[in-house]
Amino acid sequence: MKSRFSTIDLRAVLAELNASLLGMRVNNVYDVDNKTYLIRLQKPDFKATLLLESGIRIHTTEFEWPKNMMPSSFAMKCRKHLKSRRLVSAKQLGVDRIVDFQFGSDEAAYHLIIELYDRGNIVLTDYEYVILNILRFRTDEADDVKFAVRERYPLDHARAAEPLLTLERLTEIVASAPKGELLKRVLNPLLPYGPALIEHCLLENGFSGNVKVDEKLETKDIEKVLVSLQKAEDYMKTTSNFSGKGYIIQKREIKPSLEADKPVEDILTYEEFHPFLFSQHSQCPYIEFESFDKAVDEFYSKIEGQKIDLKALQQEKQALKKLDNVRKDHENRLEALQQAQEIDKLKGELIEMNLQIVDRAIQVVRSALANQIDWTEIGLIVKEAQAQGDPVASAIKELKLQTNHVTMLLRNPYLLSEEEDDDVDGDVNVEKNETEPPKGKKKKQKNKQLQKPQKNKPLLVDVDLSLSAYANAKKYYDHKRYAAKKTQKTVEAAEKAFKSAEKKTKQTLKEVQTVTSIQKARKVYWFEKFLWFISSENYLIIGGRDQQQNEIIVKRYLTPGDIYVHADLHGATSCVIKNPTGEPIPPRTLTEAGTMALCYSAAWDARVITSAWWVYHHQVSKTAPTGEYLTTGSFMIRGKKNFLPPSYLMMGFSFLFKVDESCVWRHQGERKVRVQDEDMETLASCTSELISEEMEQLDGGDTSSDEDKEEHETPVEVELMTQVDQEDITLQSGRDELNEELIQEESSEDEGEYEEVRKDQDSVGEMKDEGEETLNYPDTTIDLSHLQPQRSIQKLASKEESSNSSDSKSQSRRHLSAKERREMKKKKLPSDSGDLEALEGKDKEKESTVHIETHQNTSKNVAAVQPMKRGQKSKMKKMKEKYKDQDEEDRELIMKLLGSAGSNKEEKGKKGKKGKTKDEPVKKQPQKPRGGQRVSDNIKKETPFLEVITHELQDFAVDDPHDDKEEQDLDQQGNEENLFDSLTGQPHPEDVLLFAIPICAPYTTMTNYKYKVKLTPGVQKKGKAAKTALNSFMHSKEATAREKDLFRSVKDTDLSRNIPGKVKVSAPNLLNVKRK
């Protein structure tokens, strides 16, 4: 199968690209993989996509190729330099397979150079061919050239066009070539035409396509070869302005079948592509296209699907070959047993015909042995007797005294002597081969064919010295009867074995065809690239696998009405509950999304049970309050976070089955929103199911891997608080002085807008003030008793704060100067007797890295906490001197021009005065974070207490806003409700099942699923765990044949993609399944 461009292919496609793409501007650059890139080109009323694969191909494409979620560094560099630039030229460098695309002109030009030979390369250079970026760094030691950034690309090293070979040079090449080598192989490395064109030209001039270099090539033949090369040169010149057609050459494969009367099926697969229909392909099936560029696009786009067909065809051939081998083996066994019967019968008859000779030989040898004559002397005696013409001695051919046997050559005494003497030597050799053990399989098979008995010919017969002649004859007849019985049994067993093998082969063929058809029909949905599941109330929940996916989820898929769910733990995923209807999302779905956020975090490995929280879509933003940069996957959350109850670290693994449209009606309402009574019933049934599973585990029916049994788990106690107002929480803190000051400042200032800063996923940092020690991570003891009762503390703290600040809020209050604040700090004046309780709440809030920022007079607050450092006074003095003539309006105007958030900060502060309510409680987090957050020095200086996080969708963009992929995903989102009804975990026996999708979700969502296992933190790798679960499903008594086929069709990589870390698999009767 042809896999890459030849020189003539390259010249033809370049001619077509120059005719269609020149003058178009680059819209964007994408990468399919590390070697394949897409350049989106456009001009008014026309768009095109140019596909480049390093070392392989260049062509435009009309097919939708999968693009990487985040562009590679090489694609980003190409975007930076090539975007919006016009394609000026596309030319070949010399006659090498190197293409130079020029974007832009003069000094603003950039060159993209693609190498299509060897391992290939893609190089981005400026107008002077200085390398800006390169796909594969290398050094050409032969030419002493280094291919690296800031080096100049060596254009002069490209192979220049050479004149046609002379007759003398061609004669030398043929003379020096090894004898027996194909002529086209000898010429191909020396000429730029390619093997297909050389073979075509040889055929056109009367040569065979496989003509070899040997003595038969005379001078006139070499002249004809030179004429052929001249034709090849004419073809090369034709491709410089190529505007012809394209051809895909096909290969016919015969599909094997078990049924003899069934007509033969042919499978046509793509084999090669060419800009011309060459002579060697004229008799082959082919497809003609209006342009070579379209032919290449069709070839490479369909080749992956054909690989699946070829793989299936190969598996079918192997299955039928095994069946054929079984058939041949049984035939050979039966034939060998039949021959053994005939030989034993013939030997018995020959002994009966030569009774006297056989008895005499037995007596002679017995007497010699009785007289204790040496075995070698007995052999010498026999040879002497043979020399004297003794008939008995002449019949003895070999003494096998170690086995108490004598080999005799017996013949039919009733035949004429002339007939007896024919081919005696050959028969003796045959019989010797018969007695000797064969060496190797080939000899054994040949011997079996030569062992056919020949009547009326002398035959070597082994005679037992311990038996008489009649007894020896009877022994051979007994062997013959035994072989006959064995033959009958073998025939019966062979029929059963062959039927079993045929049945197994049919099953294999059916499975291969089923898996192939499922793989082709399988549609990958847009949400499968993320972590995902469908809640028990038919809501789609998606989560990011890494920081980049978190960014994409919030940017592309967080729409009005959706809910954002997260957990304050390292590595926790950003979850989005898709809510296209905009109706309030039920608590059960919120809880399940919170479980997902926790399980895909560090809590899974640490086995920590804590709470997640959720916010509305408009509370999530990418804009920090001071205009500071938030890293990828980090957001701002403004406003109140709604905490969920603590969740167990318990996931489930199962399959969703895609049912045909005609069967969807059976499954509508399977995941409907339940009312409270139904919810309580479901909860009771869930509880009873879990209890029964635990009982089965204790009885030995439920098991996990052996490693899990040896594992020592640290118990984690969780108390669920039901009465919030009756609980008391005692908080201890080593930072009383700082917290007292914070309470005083909070009670004396307006309550500003709550803002929080959260570093998502892998960002691990610290939030600390001066004099504080870094929080240890992780805590070994976790007390969750403060999860629910925190609300009472919030109420108490807010009431006392509001009572202290009511007077100052009703009228304009005087702001404290930095000096007064420092004096207050020294005196440690408490603002109220109730501040102690608020202090405890503040201290707990500080430990969970959620800090409150008041936007008014931020600089004064900073001065109160942090005294001015060395050198700042002189710096402030210079700034006052520099900006002494600048009023507030000028400053605000300049800040807007610079894009700073300084002016917005004041506006937010003003809004905060009017909009904030009097009794808004202080927000706390229920759980200590997994680690502090590190914030830049600038943020620490200006905003001592930054809070978490959020996002406005228009504030940032990760990729091209007009990306087609995004539009397709959004289109798919519109049909989600119908799609989810067709995905069921409870297949009906009469359903038409199309394919199965593995799903990993909170275990509570799988209450009614037909197949499910429970996953908890353990030591088993997720790949092995997925196979264990699949094996359990395959051996289920309820599994139908179609469901097993669908299970088999799922790829191993898809099975374990969404399983969180190392797990323990639990299910009823799992141990019994493992033993099978």
From Swiss-Prot:
Keywords: Coiled coil, Cytoplasm, Disease variant, Intellectual disability, Neuropathy, Nucleus, Phosphoprotein
Tissue expr: Expressed in brain, heart, liver, lung, spleen, and skeletal muscle. Also expressed at lower levels in stomach and testis.
Any Pfam family the entry gives: NFACT-R_1
UniProt biased composition (Basic and acidic residues): 429-439, 755-768, 839-854, 937-965
Classification via InterPro entries: NFACT-C, NFACT_RNA-bd, RQC_Subunit_NEMF
Chain residue ranges for the region called Disordered: 420-453, 691-715, 742-972
Sequence ranges of Basic residues compositional bias: 440-449, 870-881
GO MF term (any one): tRNA binding
Gene Ontology terms: cellular component: cytosol; cytosolic ribosome; nucleus; RQC complex
Residue ranges with Polar residues bias: 777-795
Role this protein plays: Key component of the ribosome quality control complex (RQC), a ribosome-associated complex that mediates the extraction of incompletely synthesized nascent chains from stalled ribosomes as well as their ubiquitin-mediated proteasomal degradation. Thereby, frees 60S subunit ribosomes from the stalled translation complex and prevents the accumulation of nascent polypeptide chains that are potentially toxic for the cell.
Family statement drawn from the similarity comment of this UniProt entry: Belongs to the NEMF family.
Involvement in disease: Intellectual developmental disorder with speech delay and axonal peripheral neuropathy: An autosomal recessive disorder characterized by mild global developmental delay, mild to moderate intellectual disability, motor impairment, unsteady or ataxic gait, and severe speech delay apparent in the first years of life. Signs of a peripheral axonal neuropathy, including progressive distal muscle weakness and atrophy of the lower limbs, foot and hand deformities, and dysarthria, are observed in most patients. Some patients may have autistic features or attention deficit-hyperactivity disorder.
Annotated protein name in UniProt: Ribosome quality control complex subunit NEMF
The organism's taxonomic lineage, starting at the top: Eukaryota, Metazoa, Chordata, Craniata, Vertebrata
